[in-house]
Amino acid sequence: MRGKKFISLTLSTMLCLQLLPTASFAAAPATDTGNAGLIAEGDYAIAGNGVRVTYDADGQTITLYRTEGSGLIQMSKPSPLGGPVIGGQEVQDFSHISCDVEQSTSGVMGSGQRMTITSQSMSTGLIRTYVLETSDIEEGVVYTATSYEAGASDVEVSWFIGSVYELYGAEDRIWSYNGGGEGPMHYYDTLQKIDLTDSGKFSRENKQDDTAASIPVSDIYIADGGITVGDASATRREVHTPVQETSDSAQVSIGWPGKVIAAGSVIEIGESFAVVHPGDYYNGLRGYKNAMDHLGVIMPAPGDIPDSSYDLRWESWGWGFNWTIDLIIGKLDELQAAGVKQITLDDGWYTNAGDWALNPEKFPNGASDALRLTDAIHEHGMTALLWWRPCDGGIDSILYQQHPEYFVMDADGRPARLPTPGGGTNPSLGYALCPMADGAIASQVDFVNRAMNDWGFDGFKGDYVWSMPECYNPAHNHASPEESTEKQSEIYRVSYEAMVANDPNVFNLLCNCGTPQDYYSLPYMTQIATADPTSVDQTRRRVKAYKALMGDYFPVTADHNNIWYPSAVGTGSVLIEKRDLSGTAKEEYEKWLGIADTVQLQKGRFIGDLYSYGFDPYETYVVEKDGVMYYAFYKDGSKYSPTGYPDIELKGLDPNKMYRIVDYVNDRVVATNLMGDNAVFNTRFSDYLLVKAVEISEPDPEPVDPDYGFTSVDDRDEALIYTGTWHDDNNASFSEGTARYTNSTDASVVFSFTGTSIRWYGQRDTNFGTAEVYLDDELKTTVDANGAAEAGVCLFEALDLPAAEHTIKIVCKSGVIDIDRFAYEAATLEPIYEKVDALSDRITYVGNWEEYHNSEFYMGNAMRTDEAGAYAELTFRGTAVRLYAEMSFNFGTADVYLDGELVENIILYGQEATGQLMFERTGLEEGEHTIRLVQNAWNINLDYISYLPEQDQPTPPETTVTVDAMDAQLVYTGVWNDDYHDVFQEGTARYASSAGASVEFEFTGSEIRWYGQNDSNFGVASVYIDNEFVQQVNVNGAAAVGKLLFQKADLPAGSHTIRIVCDTPVIDLDYLTYTTNA
């Protein structure tokens, strides 16, 4: 096992870091006998606060160390200095010339030490100067600057690679934070596990350019800590911070675009910060943020954040474009009662982007209508926000028609559209306003003043804060086309300053939909969004990242979705909601809004350095509020959820104080009398546990109930079925004062329950014996109850059972055994919804719909339309209905009607994700209902609809049965060949290479699936169900095994037959699965 390398340093050893007097040259190598074996003799070294850097002149490598107390922890392997890329190859033939060390300098981060390394390439003649600076102030940070001098001829470089660091001490896994903005975070998740035990090779480019704004930072870390590398620039520029898996670790580096280095000239290629840190990415990002402060990129101070930035918010986007002024005003009483203090008027209020004029269809009386809305909001004690898109000048706008000189022009002289991440387009995005055109920025300021002074809004939600295309407009006199991209934040700065001039307490949010935020926009906002996360764990991890970059006090929002509530509250996020809530959804919202309003963790101090994501047993977050520590532990959606129930450790408490641990969601004590220096306890939870540590001066007398959340069933309960001879026993030490015992061999008791856990409580005594315990007719263990007399003992428990009906049976095998009580954790069986695929003939389509395909869809296909008013309709008999669709930035909005009544507008626009529950309505009366999905704006789509059929009893749980290709139940016709490989389900498969060969299987169930291969030499098969042709399946494609090739659901109850016929060889069968009700 490779552990951390930790070596003690004496004072005399530390003094060895002071290699030479100030401004000395041609420095002698370091001599560090106290660290023999770690620091090689002859290496050069500099040190700063929490960091040490050594340079091996012979190997031309840099090694980073983290100092901890009086010791060193090696963080990087000896890593090469970066080089120029010429002709597709990195130049690496540099020879050492000199290494100069200054022990006391004033550098970019103030006082520290500096090392200057000079070397020359034999093949190109380039002289490289590599400068490293440490800081006495910023912990763990190293500043690096690189320059090149050309010799007698020009040198054309396509790319410059700066610092490169390979992590030291990795074992089975590394975690990587990736701030690049080249694509939506659904696919380019910011936090990824690099599994060193698999055969894959992790690689992320992490780009920032004219199509991708980003956090220009990457981090790799293990349990001992990690290394962060980020761009050290006061303005945005093109930069990559790639992370690449190596043979036994991973490396992080930085690079910038190439240039032509003219003969005899010197160019600076780029500057960067590296941070060595303990813990996870939070510490790395915080170190980067602190270093960037020295470059003038400074985040808002706590005093600059208005109270409204911490308020609970509701947004009109839940109605899409179908809102009206009166509809919003009519909602205010309800929202005020729920504790909402902020209202956002979202998209749909304006005529054209760029003009940002009130839409007369929404505001027939113009500004007076806008004031009617904002006045009503203010009368309810709320603030009013207005949605817009900064930098967007529109396409059909008056602004573009009258002032085309304000706009970015591409290389062909055409107006350039604002890009989506990675360089795509979006129908809602217009032409880009150039930040170097004075009139362009003035137009943004004019809008801000109009919205605040004439319409009464208190702040703004800026959306689509992605990147800015390069500008070739000759009227702007750009130093280079990249200047428009590099200066994009000027629009944000000037707009924000105009907001503050109108109201010092103005609210301003900028949102990078689905990508990391533009780092250079951060100083100009008072709240930051987690930006369209697609899972709860993405929400939590982004909160932690932005708290590191903005400050522990800075308000961060979660997304508007009910499953986000526990993640928002526990991480100290600001809750926002957009839906027109009713029924159980409204009750859930009011519950969590009430909890959030009580604890107010969004106003607390986020503490991000106590737990390491990916290495502590649970995904954990901590917020301190008014002197009380709040902890949030999560398993739902986590990338590394533990097995079982590890002990929970509360870090950061006062070691000299005693605490009671309270689950503040359910108002229950989960542990008590814990000292801060050993605050460890154990409790069971499913998705999350949110607790606070309450200081107590005296120990609590009452123990914590271990059966909290369990239902107790006494020995006399009629649900218990006794067989054989049993006797009643009465004693105050028993639960309810009674128990039942037997000394008859094979006497038994049976108890059936619906739940996920079961416990048997009884006695131990010297005359007691043994009992067999059966669970669902399977012998689990033999319990020995013989021992010192004790009542109320948990003699057996089974936890984490499937949510289903179970039976426990206790059989006496020797001596005496007794039953005091059972305790079980109840579960409500999820009702079984009947699914109706988009291609089902049960769905009626009106208008122009087209079929399209994706393996992630329910049945591999969906329907879409962009025709105005086109609709899809399903009639069903049931008590609940759900509608599933794909989300994408290419989709718009749709109206949902239920039994002819408009009930909701759904938003399909957003972070790319398939199989999304877009609409749900429960509690319908039994009988026939009709759901209709109607196109409202842009493209819409439908994956499937599910409904809960009428039923008197819950549908039994479904069971999935797997049938291997070699199973005797399968009937093969024609020539089939056996295939053996460990990639197959059971190591075997069968394939047909002749047309007409078939395989048939009879089953009883409601769903059937065929799994097999795709390959470039495979062909086509026809699938029949109950002798009726269903689908032709094309299995030709890129090689892949274990693919779901065919699926048929919604089969009526009963026996069915599937037949697969080879039309064009080759086809294969790995296995079938079918679903039946147990």
UniProtKB/Swiss-Prot annotation:
Entry annotated with the keyword Hydrolase: yes
Active site residues of this protein: D463 (nucleophile), D532
Pfam families according to UniProt: Melibiase
Gene3D superfamilies noted in UniProt: Aldolase class I, Galactose-binding domain-like
Signal peptide (UniProt feature, chain positions): 1-26
Sequence segments annotated as region (Glycoside hydrolase 36 domain): 306-570
Keywords annotated in UniProt: Glycosidase, Hydrolase, Signal
E.C. code: 3.2.1.-
Consequence when changing D463 to A/G/S: Loss of activity
Highest taxon, organism lineage: Bacteria
Biotechnology: 5 ug/ml of this enzyme pair converts A blood type to O blood type in an hour, and can be removed by centrifugation, showing the pair can be used for production of universal type donor blood.
Gene Ontology molecular function: any one: alpha-galactosidase activity
Residues covered by region (Not required for activity on soluble substrates): 699-1078
Similarity-based family: Belongs to the glycosyl hydrolase 36 family.
Miscellaneous comment text of the record: DNA was isolated from a male human fecal sample of AB+ blood type, the sequence was given to UniProtKB by the submitters.
Domain observations: Has an N-terminal glycoside hydrolase 36 domain with a probable carbohydrate-binding domain in the C-terminus. The C-terminus is not required for activity on soluble substrates but increases efficiency of cleavage in red blood cells.
Name of the protein in its database record: A type blood alpha-D-galactosamine galactosaminidase
Organism: Flavonifractor plautii (Fusobacterium plautii)
